[in-house]
Amino acid sequence: MRATTIALMMTLTTKVSAGSEDICRANSLAHNVYKEANRLEKVLASQLPLKLEEGLEFTSVSSDKNQLITYMTILYERFVLEDKIRDDGRSMKSLAHTMEIMSADSACSNEASRAFIQLGNVRQFIYIFRDGEQFLDILVERC
């Protein structure tokens, strides 16, 4: 249940496409994705915060039209994470790339989330440090 919830949370973020007059129903099923994003936001919000792994917490979720935005908090300050990454012989750039892949995998591995994206929606993952500094803003627009 928890794994399904996490995967669903990470999958249902969408971005408004420029030029679409009725993005709310601009999909092959004429399904109202605004309402679906809002419904999912409420379901997920009731289960937050949720610690996903050491140093990472799913802290909040919001929806904007056909977009579901997932806010993840890195439970360190930037300098602490940089030191940890450097000690592992990696760079912040390589970490960012890994997180992009993991976000896309998470968004596309859940059937409901993948369907949401395939209807033309976008999942958004915003990663911030515990002091509020933003680290990454990742969009998953296709699976």
Regions found by a protein language model. Give the residues of each.
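Sec-dependent signal peptide recognition
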Residues: 1-8
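N-terminal signal peptide c-region/cleavage motif recognized by signal peptidases
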Residues: 13-15
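Disulfide-bonded cysteine motifs in exported proteins
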Residues: 18-19, 102-103, 138
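N-proximal, solvent-exposed amphipathic alpha-helical segments enriched in charged/polar residues
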Residues: 20-63, 75-77
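Sequence contexts marking disulfide-bonded cysteines in secreted/extracellular proteins
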Residues: 23-25, 107-109, 142
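Mature extracytoplasmic domains of secretory-pathway proteins
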Residues: 59-109, 113
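A mature extracytoplasmic/lumenal domain signature
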Residues: 72-76, 127-131, 142
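Short, exposed beta-strand-loop hairpins at the edges of beta-sheets
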Residues: 114-137
